[in-house]
Design a protein with these regions (language model features):
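Short flanking/linker segments adjacent to small metal-binding domains or redox-active Cys/His motifs
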Residues: 100, 133-138
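Cys/His-clustered metal-coordination modules, chiefly Zn-binding fingers
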Residues: 1-123, 128
Length: 138
């Protein structure tokens, strides 16, 4: 079920890696520009079969690192609603759509991936790599 957290680094249906994710749940509260509400669910979408499944919030979906000091994320002003979650252990990243503040906006994984393409470039410029290919061949 979608409410169960899948703690493994691959799709529960076909075993492929996730290519993008999104946050769902309550809107985040803000304190000096940072999220302080840790509520909401982190959902990932499989790169092969497109199954959406719930993932652990503080964990690299690829190497399963859980040390918060090795996990981080960044955003840019030019791509509101998107985060890039990076792992310093395996140097991978995954983009996460966070539309909780955009009333009525829904995550559509393939379109989210295309719309946030500049974030792939930013992550790769910082020497992070994408594990699962995008719909667009990147």
């Amino acid at each position: 079920p979608q409410n169960d957290v899948w703690r493994h680094g691959h799709c529960p249906v076909c075993g492929s890696p996730a290519f993008i994710g999104h946050l769902s749940g309550p809107e985040p509260s803000r304190n000096e520009g940072r999220d302080i509400n840790k509520g909401g669910k982190r959902m990932h979408t499989c790169s092969y079969c497109r199954t959406t499944f719930r993932a652990k919030r503080i964990q690299c979906p690829f190497c399963l690192e859980e040390d918060a000091k090795k996990l981080d994320y960044f955003t840019t002003e030019n791509e509101p609603g998107y985060q890039v979650h990076v792992c310093r252990s395996c140097k991978s990243y995954i983009k996460i759509a966070d539309f909780r503040e955009f009333f009525g906006r829904e995550s559509i994984p393939a379109l989210d991936d295309l719309e946030s393409l500049p974030l792939d470039i930013a992550a790769q410029n910082e020497d992070f790599h994408r594990v699962a290919p995008s719909e667009w061949g990147l």
